Design a protein with these regions (language model features):
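N-terminal beta1-alpha1 ligand-phosphate binding loop
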Residues: 2-24, 182-186
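Cysteine-nucleophile active-site neighborhood
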Residues: 47-118
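Acyltransferase
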Residues: 180-201
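An anion/phosphate-binding loop that grips the pyrophosphate of nucleotide cofactors and donors
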Residues: 38
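Short, surface-exposed beta-strand/loop micro-motifs that present aromatic residues
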Residues: 167-173
């Protein structure tokens, strides 16, 4: 059973639909006991850092997520769900994130010829040992929609990178905690393979 955390985040239904298409058993919930009993947990997200943290707090999910990530349950953050795993974001100065992984979320720098938000397909440079990308070609294309990006404090957790006006840490893996800045649920067959790899952990 894979639990998708429901905290009024935008891309929840598309993540659920992608997993169901893979034959996975999925539960959408904001109930802590249900989430803690799941075999795997996904934190989706589209929206602002500060508002998302307020919602997680309001629904009593901050401690739940910290318990899940601390007890060895495979956990996947998607898009804003990646950003929330870190302590702070340029998007909402003063708001405190989950602070589960080391790093910060920065605004994508402006550059002539590049639109922000970054919306579209980019290729990834993936580490060969990255478990989420097992069985994929070296530079798969995935779909991004974001104005802020991760700069991880520990290069050792970076599983994939991309370039868009700057060097972007596009995916991280640390023990049982995985996260993607891009949207696997919108990334065609490559994205489904990534979700299948997570479901198979």
């Amino acid at each position: 059973m894979i639990a998708i955390i429901d905290y009024d985040a935008g891309n929840l239904k598309s993540v659920e639909k992608a997993l169901v298409s893979l034959g996975e058993e999925v539960l959408v919930s904001r109930d802590s006991s249900e989430i803690l009993q799941a075999d795997k947990v996904i934190l989706p997200g589209v929206g602002s850092f500060g508002e998302a943290m307020n919602n997680l707090d309001k629904f009593g999910l901050v401690d739940t997520i910290k318990k899940v990530t601390g007890n060895g349950t495979p956990f996947l953050g998607i898009c804003l769900g990646l950003q929330l795993l870190f302590k702070e974001s340029d998007e909402t100065p003063g708001a405190e994130g989950l602070d589960i992984l080391p790093g910060k979320i920065l605004k994508i720098p402006a550059k002539d010829g590049f639109k922000i938000p970054h919306m579209g397909w980019n290729s990834l440079d993936i580490k060969p040992e990255a478990r989420l990308f097992k069985g994929l070609e070296t530079n798969p294309y995935v779909y991004f929609v974001h104005s802020y990006y991760l700069k991880a404090a520990d290069e050792g957790i970076v599983a994939a990178t991309t370039e868009y006006t700057t060097h972007i840490h596009a995916s991280v893996e640390s023990g049982n905690v995985f996260a993607c800045q891009f949207h696997p649920e919108k990334s065609s067959d490559v994205g489904l393979k990534i979700l299948k790899n997570f479901a198979s952990l």
